[in-house]
Swiss-Prot record:
Chain intervals with Polar residues compositional bias: 1-10
Coiled coil is among the record's keywords: yes
Designated name of the protein: SUN domain-containing protein 3
Keywords (A to Z) from UniProt: Coiled coil, Membrane, Nucleus, Transmembrane, Transmembrane helix
Domain SUN: 196-357
Subunit annotation: Self-associates. Interacts with SYNE1 and SPAG4/SUN4. Proposed to form a spermatogenesis-specific LINC complex with SYNE1 during sperm head formation possibly implicating a SUN domain-based heterotrimer with SPAG4/SUN4 associating with SYNE1.
Coiled-coil portions: 103-142
């Protein structure tokens, strides 16, 4: 009997822990567990980190969008800046062009005034020479007058003789002034523009291009101060009033005022004394003249080759070396060389003389 109770007791003892375990397990399922304070702190820190990351992401996206908008707007601003710079440059260039134009006109006025001043000096020199001659004649008159008094000659006759000499001196002065005003060549010029002559551009060299002689507006040259080829057919010979062509060789085809048999030509250039540069290296040196048949389009007939002497007189006339049997309306001038200018040759005036055709 004592063994059975022990087995029951042992069984009780054996089940007791299972009941306790079961009761413990059931208790653990029902009763709440205690929270860990370290775990809750980590959760809050992660939330703060995620919030900061989110805010930084938003700021980064906003910055990127701002840069994209700025990059899109920059080309427009750059174009506006370039447009302002271009407009400023154009205004500055136009302002400089307006400044250049009065300078060029002032230079021309200076050249003309210098020429007039030189002519005035020559006239004053001639007047001084005339005054010297007058003084010498007065001395002679005084000597004659004294001689007349010593020879017991009537004084009235001496005074009359003095008046005659004064009149002769006045006539001499007028004659000298008349010669100064007259043409030195004393031959008709059938290449004179005012008489009806002209330059045929189709048979004439191109003019020398000089950008400094242009007036600009907004960067576009619209007014040219270069002299045309027909300036060589006009009597206005002043520094700068010449036709320039590039290089040392060129030609000009001239239609005369009427048909003539050419006998001579005249070349005129300014002197070194009135040249603003102090030299006339652009003056023509060797040149030849041809007659052209059939209304300026036919055969060329050689009339002569000549040399313009830059140290001689400014107006030089040359007799033609070959005669033509018929009347000509056109003459061609060919410049073969100049006096050393490397860029251009300048012609001031060219004349053609001869025997005109009798229209009657």
């Amino acid at each position: 009997m004592s063994g059975r109770p022990n087995s029951r007791g042992s069984s009780r003892l054996f089940r007791a822990p299972s009941e306790d375990a079961s009761s413990g397990s059931s208790g653990s399922a029902v009763l709440p567990q205690e929270e860990n304070p370290n775990a809750s702190g980590l959760t809050r820190s992660w939330k703060a980190v995620m919030g900061m990351v989110f805010i930084l992401t938003l700021l980064l996206l906003g910055f990127i969008n701002h840069m994209k908008l700025k990059e899109k707007a920059f080309p427009q601003k750059s174009r506006q800046i370039y447009a302002v710079i271009a407009e400023y440059g154009s205004r500055l260039y136009n302002y400089q062009a307006r400044l250049r134009m009065p300078k060029e006109q002032l230079e021309l006025l200076k050249k003309e005034s210098q020429t007039l001043e030189n002519n005035f000096r020559e006239i004053l020199f001639l007047i001084e020479q005339i005054d010297v001659l007058k003084a010498l004649l007065r001395d002679m008159q005084d000597g004659l007058h004294n001689y007349s008094w010593n020879a017991d000659i009537d004084p009235a006759e001496g005074w009359n003789h003095t008046e005659v000499i004064d009149e002769e001196m006045s006539n001499l002065v007028n004659y000298i002034l008349k010669k100064l005003r007259e043409d030195q060549v004393q031959m008709a010029d059938y290449a004179l523009k005012s008489a009806g002559a002209s330059v045929v551009e189709a048979g004439t060299s191109e003019s020398y291009k000089n950008n400094k002689a242009k007036l600009y507006w907004h960067g576009i040259g619209f007014l040219n101060y270069e002299m045309p080829p027909d300036i060589i057919l006009q009597p206005d010979v002043h520094p700068g009033k010449c036709w320039a062509f590039p290089g040392s060789q060129g030609h000009a085809l001239i239609k005369l005022a009427r048909k003539i048999i050419p006998t001579a030509v005249t070349m005129e250039h300014i002197s070194e004394k009135v040249s603003p540069s102090g030299n006339i290296s652009s003056a023509p040196k060797e040149f030849s003249v041809y007659g052209v048949l059939k209304q300026c389009e036919g055969e060329e007939i050689f009339l002569g080759q000549f040399v313009y002497n830059k140290t001689g007189t400014t107006v030089q006339t040359f007799a033609l070396q070959h005669e033509v049997p018929e009347f000509l309306l056109c003459v061609k001038l060919k410049i073969l060389s100049n006096w050393g200018h490397p860029n251009y040759t300048c012609l001031y005036r060219f004349r053609v003389h001869g025997t005109p055709k009798d229209d009657s």
